[in-house]
Amino acid sequence: MSNKFKGMIWLRGQVTLANKSILLQVFMPIFLIFLYKFIFSLNGAGKEIGADKLATMLLTISLPFSLAMSVGTPIIIILAEEREKHNLQSLRLAGVTAGQYILSALIWPAIIGIFYIVITPLLVGAKLSNQLFSYSLVLLLTMLVLIFFFLMVGLFCKNQVMAQSLSVPAMLLAAFIPMFSNMSEDLSKVLRYSFMGLFSSYMKDWSHFHLWSGEFLALVVWLLLFAGLSFYLMRHLQILDD
């Protein structure tokens, strides 16, 4: 690992810690999870549908929001800030490649995403003892696709104003697709091939879930598409050279 790459990872960590707005978005999902639990407890949902189904429902609602808010939005804001302040040109002159830049942008979001993948089931009381492998695989793949999706959006933003305008729709899109999939069978058939389709299908019935499916292949296609577009934007905008 080169010193430039280590320095960029360290710098992004410092930017995250120094920006209170980003820190708030990173930790806000924990508050929202407890808020969801409180609201459902007031409605007596646990007694009506059972504790296990309630935990699964909370997991389905909480995880997309947690990943989109704590991982996605900070990516967009940080990239837009770097572009607005012309930090990218300085990195280019320092010899940082597009690959190094994109990879350094993935490290901290991946760490934060893994944190929420681990802690969310514990907070909602979901029992995953027999589903640890499939849960980990589905969520890690989904997280990686989301990171590249928000990275693509962030590279598209020219300034922080544009980032604020696009981050909310992007976050809501990622968060609400699983909810829309559960609203009707027709929507489910369409959205099953979206970049949140594998997650939605898994959360509907993880006990009978099969990884090698159309949803899995669609997710791989989305991953390649978002990653390819991210590198294309780097080249097209002439931010960094390979």
Show where each model-derived region lies.
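Membrane-interface helix termini and inter-helical loops of multi-pass transporters
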Residues: 41-53, 124-129, 203-205
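Alpha-helical transmembrane segments and their short interhelical loops
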Residues: 98-99, 106-158
